[in-house]
């Protein structure tokens, strides 16, 4: 005996909805093979020791961070970084204050991480996450872990196989699991926003 699924209308006065009305308008494979996903999969952020070994002025920092974040431009709020944002991050203690108006590796690493985490967390929560992470890891280890997990998670999410993402932490801790969860939340949002835009949605 064949059972036909029926879609229940929102109310008695709603127009009847047929099952075909809620079929996906785009097949997943078409999305995965799209230019949007191809661009996302080009994301390759620098590791800590690849960040500039000379200090940069604020405008140079903005240009540098925006360049590396560009593959994510379709699924992050724009602008991703501005002079006033940097000033605010310094003011609340998220980023160490510049020395003679110049920013070094640790500050640039912080700014890149903030650009990612602020997409899914309020700034106060990002600060709390940094404070927790600092209990177990130095700045280079913490930054490289974020980048490793982000790149691996994006490649896993935006592929047909969607294989599980290995945890690259040298030692899995509660702190590393929190960071991994934050990265996962960002990638989930990136997937949703990019898929909607592929379907014609413009925020």
Question: Can you describe what each PLM-predicted range is?
Answer:
Residues 129-203:
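Intrinsically disordered, low-complexity, charge-dense segments enriched in Lys/Arg
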Residues 4-7, 14, 19, 53, ...:
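Intrinsically disordered, low-complexity regions
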Residues 16-133:
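Basic helix-turn-helix/winged-helix DNA-binding cores
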Residues 2-35, 47, 74-75, 174, ...:
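Non-catalytic recognition/regulatory regions in large multidomain proteins
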């Amino acid at each position: 005996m064949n059972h036909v699924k029926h879609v229940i209308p929102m109310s008695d006065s709603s127009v009847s909805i047929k099952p075909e009305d809620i079929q996906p308008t785009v097949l997943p494979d078409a999305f995965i093979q799209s230019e949007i996903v191809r661009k996302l999969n080009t994301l390759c952020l620098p590791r800590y020791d690849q960040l500039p070994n000379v200090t940069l002025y604020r405008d140079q920092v903005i240009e540098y961070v925006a360049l590396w974040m560009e593959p994510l431009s379709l699924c992050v709020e724009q602008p991703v970084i501005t002079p006033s944002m940097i000033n605010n991050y310094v003011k609340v203690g998220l980023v160490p204050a510049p020395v003679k108006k110049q920013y070094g590796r640790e500050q640039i690493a912080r700014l890149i991480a903030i650009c990612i985490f602020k997409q899914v967390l309020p700034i106060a929560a990002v600060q709390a996450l940094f404070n927790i992470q600092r209990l177990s890891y130095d700045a280079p280890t913490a930054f490289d872990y974020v980048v490793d997990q982000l790149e691996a998670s994006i490649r896993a999410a935006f592929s047909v196989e969607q294989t599980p993402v290995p945890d690259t932490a040298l030692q899995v801790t509660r702190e590393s699991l929190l960071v991994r969860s934050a990265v996962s939340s960002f990638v989930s949002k990136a997937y949703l926003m990019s898929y909607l835009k592929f379907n014609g949605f413009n925020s």
